[in-house]
Amino acid sequence: MPVMAPAMAPIILAPEIIHNIIYFLIHDYIVLLDDDSWGLVPGYGRYAAISRIWQNEIERETFASLRLDLDRLLQANFIVTHRRRRLVRTIKLDVALPMPGPVESPETDEEKLRNNRRLQVTFEAFMRFMCPWQPYDVRHGGVKLYVDTSIPDDAFTWRPITPQSRKRRAKLERRRASSLVELTNPSRISEYPPILAITEYKGNSSDLNIHISAVATCVLLAKLPAAKVAFIDWWRCNHFSRIRSDLAAAISQIKYPIDHLSISDSSLTYGDWFPFSPPPASSIQEVDELSISIRNMSQRLKRLDIYDISISDELFFPKTPSIDMMPIWDGLVMISLHYLPITHSGEWLFLPDPDASSSSEEEPDSDDSSSWDGWPSEESQPKPSIAAPAMQQFYLAAAHAALQMPALKQMKLIALLENGICWHKFWYYSEEMMARALWTSSSGFVPDEEVLDRWRMVPRKHIEIDLEVEISEDENALESLDDENDI
């Protein structure tokens, strides 16, 4: 009688191993020209038929990141069922704009209106889709929201680079740099119920896209009361200074507390010099409403970052404070301000060095730019480098504010000057048994005694120790202290 071989026991893998096998099987670099194109491969859904375990893993990866445009939003409720909401970690909202006009010409009024209408209907469709979601519907930590625009011509960016495509891309970038997508009816967004499942917001992640107005961003943010991290991009704030008043009003509508708020102009890279011009007379306000709105909102923050936008000392303290209405920042721990050398009203915070050579002596940049692209030319514009008297008042206002910030651990105030040539930086840092203040500049700036006395009061009030003061001309002094304190 033949002896039967014993049946082999099935191989049972740990769930973590199965997860990793499935993950790397269904993910790859989709576009070889782009290192950031890691994603789900075409046809990955067929693996769901292997077993129930595989089906659950495939579904989890499918709904972890939703890419929604207007067409998909209209069908999303039928696909993203109530049970699947818990699988969603990120939503990438794509405002798919109509085909643009010729890249050789500026955006027309008709084209701008079409784009604005598309933003309006996309935001409204998103509100209708997300408003029913509750915090208990989604995973712990909520859902991150990323918002960008796209146009049908975006596909060309994945093609092999040729001299012709490079020239076309340069023209397209300049055309997009002069465009801004705005809501046609912001009040309609305000009428929707709040979205409670979104805990983080970020938009305008690519310089190649047509950018969404910071006002539209804030209108949407005002409907996201669970958001703890938010990034507001005021694209080319100097060029689009006309929206400053509307942006101030939109920020004032954000009533809830946020852990971390960042407001920046993504068209600039910190440290790069850019020729700034005074704002047009039509956009100048006697009262800096934007700085006041940010100041009011910052009293509900833990961390505030501002990069490359024009502000005034109203950001820190009202010019005519009332004893009964003194601002107080109970929870603010960190503030980082990288500010332009010119205020909203056209006042220069830094003056040109009379001994420095004029920028007109430099070789002009021949980038084939056209007259309509909105980028100012440097020509013979002097570059500011020496702190104006207004900077003493600026630091005094900052000290007044710091006295009202009992939780403050760090404040950085850094001027956007010519990288590697000029610098002007301030840094305040405190911990349980130590408090430091550093001023470092290329022009030999020294704070006056009133400023120093006011800053010495800050740690005495909050942690009852004396302030260590350092005045330097070392460009890297601030970074060295950062490393020393491991910030």
Where are these regions (language model features)?
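Leucine-rich solenoid repeat modules
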Residues: 128-133, 312, 317-487
